[in-house]
């Protein structure tokens, strides 16, 4: 979902799906929103679930301009994040919309990169910042994903996220996947290695095998 025009299209699709079923839409709609928090707000009024990326939810894109943040600057940015995110949570509560907080290894914010670098710890903290706000606001309809194209990084990061949530008395469902897995046998093996290792640990609630092929090829 790139902009308001796409949100309008989603509303029309949702209306058609709902009109053909007396018990609500035939299938839930999910909006995957990057770069524009106002689009996430609008989509949350229309669809059943909205995915946001912590790395670009507040700022439109990584700027690579500010490398060092003072503690005061860091806290100011966290407060800005909290204030903006609460607006979305309030909309989701009103419309009974679920959220997916989806962290990507390749799109961590400048602020996270400045303190944690390009690390599993940084990915986990990027997710936890949003979860802490959600917990304070008593919003529980959340699923998490934390993905990387490197399977070792992905597995390490998800395990670390599970540990960190336990440390802070949190428990949210996890969606597993290896991003940019590729195609053919390599893409399938790569996904199987990353997802399978976590499932063997008893970690994970939903999965997606992401392939750079026709969409129907992702179906089991």
Describe the role of every protein-language-model region.
Residues 71-81, 113-220:
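Catalytic alpha/beta core domains of metabolic enzymes, predominantly
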Residues 20-23, 47-84, 111-122:
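Glycine-rich tight-turn/loop motif centered on a GG-T
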Residues 1, 27-33, 50-52, 97-103, ...:
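Hydrophobic faces of well-ordered beta-strands that scaffold small-molecule active sites
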Residues 39-44, 81-98:
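Short amphipathic alpha-helices and their capping/turn segments at secondary-structure boundaries
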Residues 2-5, 33-39, 54-58, 103-109, ...:
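Active-site-proximal loop/turn and secondary-structure-junction residues that shape catalytic pockets
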Residues 10-23, 89-93, 158, 162-166:
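Surface-exposed amphipathic alpha-helices with a cationic face
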Residues 1-46:
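N-terminal active-site wall of soluble small-molecule enzyme domains
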Residues 1-17, 54-76, 142-151:
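Glycine-rich, proline-tolerant flexible connector loops at the mouths of alpha/beta enzymes
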């Amino acid at each position: 979902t790139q902009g308001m025009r796409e949100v309008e299209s989603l509303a029309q699709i949702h209306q058609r799906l709902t009109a053909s079923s007396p018990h609500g839409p035939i299938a839930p709609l999910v909006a995957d929103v990057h770069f524009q928090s106002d689009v996430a707000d609008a989509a949350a009024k229309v669809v059943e679930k909205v995915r946001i990326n912590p790395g670009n939810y507040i700022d439109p894109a990584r700027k690579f301009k500010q490398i060092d943040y003072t503690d005061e600057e860091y806290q100011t940015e966290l407060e800005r994040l909290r204030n903006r995110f609460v607006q979305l949570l309030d909309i989701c509560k009103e419309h009974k919309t679920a959220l997916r907080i989806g962290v990507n290894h390749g799109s961590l914010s400048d602020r996270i990169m400045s303190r944690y670098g390009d690390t599993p710890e940084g990915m986990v903290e990027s997710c936890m910042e949003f979860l802490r706000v959600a917990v304070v606001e008593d919003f529980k309809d959340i699923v998490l994903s934390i993905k990387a194209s490197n399977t070792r990084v992905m597995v390490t990061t998800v395990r670390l996220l599970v540990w960190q949530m336990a440390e802070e008395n949190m428990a949210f469902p996890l969606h597993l996947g290896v991003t940019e897995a590729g195609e053919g046998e390599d893409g399938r093996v790569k996904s199987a290695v990353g997802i399978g290792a976590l499932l063997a640990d008893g970690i994970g609630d939903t999965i997606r095998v992401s392939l750079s092929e026709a969409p129907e090829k992702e179906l089991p």
